[in-house]
A protein has these predicted regions:
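Pre-Walker A (Motif I) flank of P-loop NTPase domains
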Residues: 9-13
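Conserved lysine of the Walker
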Residues: 24
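A glycine- and Lys/Arg-enriched "phosphate-lid" helix/loop adjacent to the NTP-binding pocket
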Residues: 104, 108-173
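NTP-dependent small-molecule kinase module
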Residues: 2-7, 32, 148-215
Length: 215
């Protein structure tokens, strides 16, 4: 994001980002399991869909039956999911001093609805910042995967996964551009690496951020 955003003084907020099939769900679960084994309270969540409102948004934006949506409609639907998610799930957990791990957050909107849809990035960012109260993760882990390889892992595709290869290539570049503008905030990892090696890289980075977490 172009703005430094707002970071909480309590808890730890870690976000996993990247294209389809990059292993975000696997690595977020591994990180949760390790942190819990170290005595930390952890909330594992995801976007879109981890609230009652979000489930309805997820159904609309991902179902192939939805068909075409205007770009602005899609941006606003994802923003609605984020607003509800931050207000009812993410912020309360951070205020309790927990570690919050989310599978996707604002960068996904910037990469998919901004770069992927070739929409005005500043407009997309402004909407997402407002929806999330400008709350930013303390660390964003970007699992970088070549789109053809990542998409090849799916037998059935949802509405977004079913977009063209060119769309997903723009999304990948959008993620990399975000990381390139703020390299200190991101941990960019080649998703082709072995699962355990990726996990070790993530653990090594997270260890240094645990000081503000209440066990």
């Amino acid at each position: 994001m172009t703005s430094p955003g707002r970071f909480t003084d309590t808890g730890l907020f870690v976000c996993f980002e990247g294209g389809e099939g990059g292993g975000k769900s696997t690595q977020s679960r591994l990180l949760k399991d390790w942190l819990e084994s170290e005595g930390h309270r952890v909330l594992l969540t995801f976007e879109p869909g981890d609230t009652a409102v979000g489930k309805e948004v997820r159904r609309i934006v991902l179902s192939p039956q939805t068909g075409e949506l205007s770009n602005r409609t899609e941006v606003l639907l994802y923003a609605a999911d984020k607003a509800e998610h931050v207000d009812t799930v993410v912020l309360p957990a951070l205020e309790r001093g927990e570690v919050v791990i989310t599978d996707r957050y604002v960068d996904s909107a910037l990469a998919y609805q901004g770069a992927g849809r070739v929409e005005d990035l500043s407009g997309v960012e402004a909407v997402q910042r407002w929806a999330t109260r400008d709350l930013r993760p303390h660390l964003t882990v970007l699992l970088d995967v070549e789109p053809a390889a990542g998409l090849g892992r799916f037998e059935e595709r949802d509405r977004i996964e079913g977009e063209s290869l060119e769309f997903h290539q723009r999304v990948r570049q959008g993620f990399l551009d975000l990381a390139g503008r703020d390299p200190g905030h991101y941990l960019v990892i080649d998703a082709r690496l072995p699962i355990d090696e990726i996990h070790e890289l993530i653990r090594a980075r997270v260890v240094g951020l645990l000081g503000q977490v209440t066990s």
